[in-house]
Amino acid sequence: MPTRNHLFYGLTNSVCSQCLSKVEAKVLFRDGQVYLSKHCLIHGAEEVLIADDIEYYQKMQGYIKPGDMPLTFNTPIRYGCPYDCGLCPDHEQHSCLSLIEVSDRCNLACSICYADSGPDAVSATTHTPRRHRSLEEIEFLIDAVVANEGEAQVVQLSGGEPTIHPQFFEIVALTKRKPIKHLMINTNGIRIAQDLAFVEKLSQYKPGIEIYLQFDSFEAGVLMELRGSDLRSVREAAIAHLNQFNLSTTLVVTLKKGLNDHEIGKIIDYALAQPCIRGVTFQPIQAAGRLEGYDARRDRYPLTAVRRAILEQTSHFKPEDIVPVPCHPDALAMAYALKVNGKMIPLTGLINPDEFVNVMPNSVLYEQDESLKQKLFDLFSTSHSPRSAATSLKQLLCCLPLVPVPDTLDYENIFRIMIVQFMDAYNFDVKSVKRSCIHIVHPDGRLIPFETYNLFYREGSAGQAKLKDVQQVNAP
């Protein structure tokens, strides 16, 4: 009797990548890899790689914790996920990070932009004017986050390019007056490179502010393909200015398979040598926004492949150092390290997260301490700023026997690697998106998961028409 060439691991819901109708999807193991297999009644079967490491994929399933609920929900459950965003009461996680787009305008025209931003006055996609949002509109969006969160952990100002907004510092001052613990500025770094006085003024808002700096490559050809401009000197000048004022910075690297994935280790080494840099975030491209010519079979670069590249291209981390993030383990992986006396010490050189997240029999006694396990969950959370991560880590280390805690441990001693895998129509997984904790604030005040926003809810998105059809057909 013939047998299948795969193991059937589980079942979820996805969408057809062609018509975006909801379809059932199998999770299959085959030849050491994990696939999402689905069948649309109109467009037939399709299969996409979602992980190339079965062991790590299975490990992710154990890194879950009860979700934190927002104080209020924004929409009722009416049409089913992903057509009720949000947040609706069926969503399993609050907003670890809330993203506010303050402008449609940008001083670059990146080929991979998910937001369709650019320097032209009118969008070629929506045929609507690109504009800066007013201070009143932005305050409305900030207040929507605060209404959901009470005290928001992290708010990120994005765009477009937020630093070209004519009221940029008024926006920063407004945000800092609100109950928000940490503010991120998502930027391409051009203004930071060109205007030292701008950086000095930004530094006056320390602590509690961080630069989320685009940094994709050291190679001109890569930057030309991704960003349309050779930005090497811009990056160098920006980081020099940020170092001058020790302004907390995370490098964010957009990864394209076969283009800049060979630079992962070099970027980490560079980041470790910069006083202002607290970490690196790697984001593989997904089929969204302006991206053209994306082939899901050829170009898919899953989280597990990025994790492996970090391990292969650097000597800083071991496999057990890079672990799933409990609030959204399917999409996020993280490694913490200490920078002490010029040396980098991986966090798991001091503690082993597995021993705390998965309480095993016959293990050390202190792993049974629920408060200790909660402190580990708190540490491995996307809602941390470098300063709050330092505090959380110090509290954790103080609980552990025989672990010396540096007297001067502060946010300058923290270094974090993050892998963020966003979903698109090909690898969309309803089970996973329900745990999404990175949310974009819609102009009407709804907080919507990053993936569903770009797929269904962004003006001009591929799924906008599908969303309207579903809602009309099922209207009460």
Regions found by a protein language model. Name each.
Residues 138-156, 165-284:
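Radical SAM/AdoMet-radical enzyme domain recognition
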Residues 1-79, 336-476:
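Radical SAM enzyme core and accessory elements
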Residues 21-23, 83-84, 97, 196-197, ...:
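Short alpha-helical segments and helix-capping/turn motifs at coil-helix boundaries
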Residues 121-123, 219-225, 290-293:
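A short acidic, helix-capping loop that chelates divalent metal ions and anchors anionic groups
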Residues 102-104, 114-117, 159, 187, ...:
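Glycine-rich, histidine-containing beta strand-loop boundary motifs that form or position
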Residues 43, 107, 218, 256-258, ...:
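Short, solvent-exposed loop/turn segments at secondary-structure junctions
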Residues 28, 32-56, 61-187, 191-197, ...:
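Conserved alpha-helical substructure of the radical SAM core
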Residues 226, 232, 243-409:
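Radical SAM enzyme [4Fe-4S]-AdoMet core and its adjacent flexible, acidic
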